[in-house]
Amino acid sequence: MTESFQKLEKIGEGTYGVVYKARERNTNRVVALKKIRLENENEGIPATTIREILLLKNLKHSTIVELSDVIYNNNKMYLVFEYVELDLRRYLDRMSDEGRLVEEGFVRKMSQQLLTAMEYCHSRNIFHRDLKPQNILVDPKENIKLADFGLGRAAGIPLRTYTTEVVTLWYRPPELLLGCKYYDASVDVWSAACIMAEVVLMRPFFPGDSEIDQLFRIFKVLGTPNNSRWSNVENFPNYKVEFPVWDPVDLKTIFRGDPDFVDLISKMLEYDPKMRMTAKNGLSHKYFEGMPLIME
């Protein structure tokens, strides 16, 4: 590894391993070098993981961080990504420190780019499963790019990050919190809506500190679900008949800006994944009227 890349600094410990800012020696290009943590490094990497990760090299879109190379030696796997300095978490923290709110134009542009990246991957049957502000990168022109798409299925999502930090629950959809084992692209749509809400509110929408706290925070806003609202939910492994019953809150009282934005995220936060708006349908929502589609 050291022959090809000079590690400049450690920039993070993500869900899947350590990330370094590095320089490619023969081109001088600055890249993000992600060392994938493997459950048992002695056994080597399963062929399925290698296949899945190689598929990610085919994802080429302006809204997705490009995976330019996969390096595998001594049972270690490194992924070489284009380097983008800022992520949405740090972008929002910086705005907050400066006492500034995010402009409406940024919210619309970011939401459209986020849904475009999702639609591009979902149409190829690749899901993210771990969308959060930390893996949405913001370039100097305030365009966003999604990182870590597809790694969830390729590497498996651990319960803890590389250190012992627990993977955040704030963007996790209710079907996963309720123990549903089968899920699809709609999990990403829920996470995206939570992120869009956070950008507008300048604070996490559902900042739970445990799975039950996470569920109850969702229920307090959207109402406690039951079979009449979400078919079969009462049979999910973690559903309890003793759940407190909350009525839904009108989202317009939380988001006082553009009513089209409220309509869009309410459709993305539909409890029943089958009824939840898809990324593709989201892109043709009235909220994006007049905005040109983003081509590859």
Curated annotation (Swiss-Prot):
Leading EC class: transferase
GO molecular function annotation: ATP binding; cyclin binding; cyclin-dependent protein serine/threonine kinase activity; protein serine kinase activity
Annotated GO CC locations: cyclin-dependent protein kinase holoenzyme complex; cytoplasm; nucleus
Domain Protein kinase: 5-288
Residues annotated to bind ATP: I11, G12, E13, G14, T15, Y16, G17, V18, V19, K34
Subcellular location: Nucleus
Protein name as it appears in the record: Cyclin-dependent kinase 1
Keywords, in A-Z order: ATP-binding, Cell cycle, Cell division, Kinase, Mitosis, Nucleotide-binding, Nucleus, Serine/threonine-protein kinase, Transferase
Coiled-coil regions, chain positions: none
UniProt similarity note: Belongs to the protein kinase superfamily. CMGC Ser/Thr protein kinase family. CDC2/CDKX subfamily.
UniProt key word Cell division: yes
E.C. numbers: 2.7.11.22
